[in-house]
């Protein structure tokens, strides 16, 4: 009887160990993807997808897409790209902004939407990791209930942990120059992540990451600048009259958000401003705010991507864990999230002091994060200019304007650009290529 009990206990322990072993099989998993449903033929680049577990028990499973540089992956820079949001999937970067694939904008007929190659992918010159973060974004998920909700500063730590583990499993890239990039809301998280990596590099027990700098497009940085400068931007772009602009300046004194409820005169003019601009497409003021879903509508690609990413053959090809999520959504707004970084300006200051390069660029037709606000917070850093405001060119054509500073920061506008890179793919690619190669714009 005793022997039977011992046998039963041993059997239970072996079963438990087996289950633990199986549970670890999807942790830190990686798969090479050679074909993707919707794309004709083999992929013309090397794609890897997988999960990296972070947290004390690796309960958070972060999903990534990794694409090797199409030029020289052994030596080219490695760029981690963080999509804004928070809660917007890395597919936004991969299929809309600076990746090697895009949705083919055909009328949806019930079949799987098609993918096409892009001409100006940043993977032409760098290896790229597109990361679904925070947890709950894209295909990332948690195996247990989280007691600490994600936050800006918390994400910086999780991303740092992700990178340490990812590079531990891809040691052939550990010596490559490493950069962090992103756009929109990532303007808060990326500088904090850079600082977190920099601090980690100084600690004895961490494997150093070959961090060189960061790149940000139309980055949300501080609402004091980003939000308040929407008014002068609208005036410069002829969206509001001279008279209204002067009235706003006089009554609001540069403070156009969180106006005191007793300041009725300022509120009156802010309301008039909102009425004049509420039908303007925020991400690009020259684009239409579509009311119908047609291929000519900017947001049509979002619908196509939703059909594509929720197709079972696509999920199988990407090796998506069935535990991950139900329906994939491009931007999941239901993530409990603590917005604990109100301004990333101090992080920029610290990163500059630590000697990291930075490229800050602005599409000049974005009213969400207008270039005027970005210029204002850069001025607040009070760095000396080494290359004053000048045009940067592509084949004798003005592609934008740029200024360089002694702290290794470069600011550039992109003429005709919007909130993200896809509005001007050639210009943003050429700008990035020159900067990442250490060339002047």
From Swiss-Prot:
Primary location group: secreted
Signal peptide: 1-29
Sites where a glycan is attached: 109, 350, 382
GO terms under biological process: proteolysis
EC number: 3.4.16.-
Tissue: Ubiquitous.
Disulfide bridge positions per record: 88-331, 252-266, 290-297
Keyword Cytoplasm: no
Subcellular location: Secreted
TM regions (residue ranges): none
GO cellular component: extracellular region
Protein name listed in UniProt: Serine carboxypeptidase-like 4
Organism: Arabidopsis thaliana
